[in-house]
Amino acid sequence: MKKLTKTNSHRQQKLASIINEALIEILRRGKMLDSRLFDCPLTITKVIVTADLKIANCYFLPFNTKLTIDEIMDALSNSKNAIRNFITNKINMKFSPDIRFHYDHGFDNAIKVEELLKNI
């Protein structure tokens, strides 16, 4: 009988962990990044790597910033090559996965659920 839930392999989890740590490091240093990201504190909430290890979906949450989500996405997109090169130096693989950034709606959804529960 097949499993209904798909679990990540050990390699996916390990690569996601390495990418998460590398992203935190490069965002903390601020080198090689779009200048708009210098005063924009971001939290990397999770990294999900596809089964073929070719795509890393990185979810972020900004805090206390004047930038819109679209501006942050644009700045991250402009910095993608530098970030990918930094990650390539951290992993021991033939190729580096394509990094894709996504705004993490989980916090917003949790607030909406909490408000709905208060109204019951």
Swiss-Prot record:
Please name the Gene3D superfamilies in this protein's record: 3.30.300.20
UniProt-listed GO biological process terms: maturation of SSU-rRNA
- What is a single molecular function from GO for this protein? ribosomal small subunit binding
Q: Which PROSITE patterns match?
A: RBFA
**What GO terms fall under cellular component here?**
cytosol
Q: Which UniProt keywords apply?
A: Cytoplasm, Ribosome biogenesis
Q: Does the keyword Mitochondrion apply?
A: no
Where found? Cytoplasm
* Pfam families listed in its UniProt record: RBFA
What InterPro entries does the record point to? KH_dom-like_a/b, RbfA, RbfA_dom_sf, Ribosome-bd_factorA_CS
Q: Can the keyword Cytoplasm be found in this entry's annotation?
A: yes
Cystine crosslinks = none
Say which family it is in. Belongs to the RbfA family.
Q: What does this protein do?
A: One of several proteins that assist in the late maturation steps of the functional core of the 30S ribosomal subunit. Associates with free 30S ribosomal subunits (but not with 30S subunits that are part of 70S ribosomes or polysomes). Required for efficient processing of 16S rRNA. May interact with the 5'-terminal helix region of 16S rRNA.
Q: How does it assemble?
A: Monomer. Binds 30S ribosomal subunits, but not 50S ribosomal subunits or 70S ribosomes.
Q: Which PANTHER family match?
A: RIBOSOME-BINDING FACTOR A, CHLOROPLASTIC-RELATED
What is the official name of this protein in its record?
Ribosome-binding factor A
